[in-house]
């Protein structure tokens, strides 16, 4: 018993190829050129997708996540307790920290007994997913709506942001405290 194997296409995209001779017009490729011109003309009248940055700024999504910032409380103390949940939740493993015990003369700097002596985010690894913000029980880290994610630079060391670049400036913390008290 002989079985014949037919050329069956599983995807449905298989086409039969013909080797027929081209006509004179087809050999001049006029039909293909006209089709290409029609596509070009169609795109010419569409709405432009490019903008003239920085004169025009594209509107960001309401769920946009920008630059990282470590929050301070109303008294200017850092919220971070170096629990490490942000580092554990980071899928890119971009966050590293070293915990330290607060000394008696540092009560005005840190809220809890334990604080992050070293807190670094490697911006070359960060994917701005926001999981660190969600994992933090003290609401110490958040992603701002700043449109400048990471300033350009040529040296890798400048992309590892330490507490000097991440901690919220004192004047902004005081403004936030005044806004909370006003509400």
UniProtKB/Swiss-Prot annotation:
Its cofactor is [4Fe-4S] cluster. SUPFAM superfamilies: 4Fe-4S ferredoxins. Binds 2 [4Fe-4S] clusters per subunit. One of its GO terms (biological process) is aerobic respiration. Its main location: membrane. [4Fe-4S] cluster 1 binds at residues 80, 83, 86, 136. The keyword Hydrolase does not apply. Signal peptide: none annotated. One of its GO terms (cellular component) is plasma membrane. PROSITE patterns: 4FE4S_FER_1 (PS00198), 4FE4S_FER_2 (PS51379). It is found in: Cell inner membrane. NDH-1 is composed of 14 different subunits. Subunits NuoA, H, J, K, L, M, N constitute the membrane sector of the complex. Belongs to the complex I 23 kDa subunit family. NDH-1 shuttles electrons from NADH, via FMN and iron-sulfur (Fe-S) centers, to quinones in the respiratory chain. The immediate electron acceptor for the enzyme in this species is believed to be ubiquinone. Couples the redox reaction to proton translocation (for every two electrons transferred, four hydrogen ions are translocated across the cytoplasmic membrane), and thus conserves the redox energy in a proton gradient. This is NADH-quinone oxidoreductase subunit I. It comes from Flavobacterium psychrophilum (strain ATCC 49511 / DSM 21280 / CIP 103535 / JIP02/86).
């Amino acid at each position: 018993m002989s079985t014949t194997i037919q050329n069956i296409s599983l995807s449905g995209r298989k086409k039969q190829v013909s080797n027929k001779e081209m006509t004179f017009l087809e050999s001049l490729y006029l039909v293909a050129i006209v089709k290409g011109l029609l596509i070009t003309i169609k795109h010419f009248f569409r709405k432009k997708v490019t903008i003239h940055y920085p004169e025009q700024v594209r509107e960001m999504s309401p769920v946009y996540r920008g630059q990282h910032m470590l929050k301070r409380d109303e008294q200017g103390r850092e919220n971070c307790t170096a629990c490490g949940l942000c580092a554990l939740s980071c899928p890119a493993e971009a966050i590293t920290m070293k915990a330290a015990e607060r000394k008696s003369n540092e009560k005005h700097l840190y809220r809890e007994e334990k604080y992050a002596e070293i807190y670094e985010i490697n911006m070359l690894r960060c994917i701005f997913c926001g999981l660190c913000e969600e994992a933090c029980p003290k609401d110490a880290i958040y992603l701002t709506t700043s449109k400048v994610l990471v300033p350009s630079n040529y040296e890798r060391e400048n992309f590892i942001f330490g507490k000097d670049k991440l901690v919220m400036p004192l004047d902004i913390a005081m403004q936030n405290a005044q806004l909370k008290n006003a509400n």
